[in-house]
UniProtKB/Swiss-Prot annotation:
This is Dermatoxin-S1. The modification Glutamine amide is found at residue 76. It comes from Phyllomedusa sauvagei. It comes from the Eukaryota. GO terms for cellular component: extracellular region; membrane; other organism cell membrane. Belongs to the frog skin active peptide (FSAP) family. Dermatoxin subfamily. Expressed by the skin glands. The keyword Signal applies. One of its GO terms (biological process) is defense response to bacterium. It is found in: Secreted; Target cell membrane. Its main location: secreted. Residues 1-22 form the signal peptide. Disulfide bonds: none annotated. Pfam families: FSAP_sig_propep.
Length: 77
């Protein structure tokens, strides 16, 4: 009877140890996925920001060019 009890404890222990390793791996995988999601959100936000800055710079450049053209025409006339 004692041999059977020891065998059952050994089987239970050997079953629980790999289970805990699997849970740790799963948690690490979930953490990596969360980090990947955060990084992709940051990249998208940065892309949107750069797009907005680019259009603002283009608008300002166009306004400066128009003003410069007017100054040149006034100086010639």
């Amino acid at each position: 009877m004692a041999f059977l009890k020891k065998s059952l404890f050994l089987i239970l222990f050997l079953g629980l140890v790999p289970l805990s390793f699997c849970e740790n791996d799963k948690r690490e995988g979930e953490n990596e996925e969360e980090q990947d999601d955060d990084q992709s959100e940051e990249k998208r936000a940065l892309g949107t920001l750069l797009k907005g800055v680019g259009s603002a710079v283009a608008t300002v450049g166009k306004m400066v060019a128009d003003q410069f053209g007017k100054l040149l025409q006034a100086g010639q006339g």
